[in-house]
């Protein structure tokens, strides 16, 4: 059985894996933008921008509303909060593991008396 939360997290992390999409998220954090406005800083075609927008939409990070021919995009940060919670859940584990590794390295690098 597939857990829908993990499926959505997969989409979120996939969306965040691209620098262009992360930059689009940063722009959307300041407010609503058209797809053309999102594309402009990257000197990409409208078609390329639409592909990025669709990835963000699938991840639930972007909401799109259509007004006439214009597509307006806005940020939905809820999936980012879920991804952050997932990462935080493992933060203690990795911190403990790195502390143990540091301790081991200190012990093995001491000169013998």
Describe the predicted segments one by one:
Residues 1-8, 26, 81-113:
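Amphipathic alpha-helical dimerization/coiled-coil segments
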Residues 2, 7-47, 70-85:
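N-terminal helix-turn-helix DNA-binding core of bacterial DNA-binding proteins
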Residues 53-54:
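Short, hydrophobic-biased segments on the C-terminal half of alpha helices
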Residues 57-68, 72-75:
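Beta-hairpin "wing" of winged helix-turn-helix
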Residues 50:
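Conserved catalytic core of two-component sensor histidine kinases
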């Amino acid at each position: 059985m597939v857990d829908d939360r993990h499926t959505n997290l997969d989409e979120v992390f996939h969306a965040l894996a691209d620098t262009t999409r992360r930059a689009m998220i940063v722009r959307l954090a300041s407010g609503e933008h058209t797809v053309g406005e999102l594309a402009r800083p990257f000197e990409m075609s409208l078609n390329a921008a639409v592909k990025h927008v669709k990835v963000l939409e699938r991840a639930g990070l972007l909401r799109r509303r259509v007004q006439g021919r214009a597509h307006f995009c806005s940020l939905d940060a809820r999936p980012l909060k879920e991804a952050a919670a997932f990462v935080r859940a493992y933060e203690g584990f990795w911190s403990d593991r790195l502390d143990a590794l540091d301790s081991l390295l200190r012990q093995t690098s001491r000169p013998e008396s």
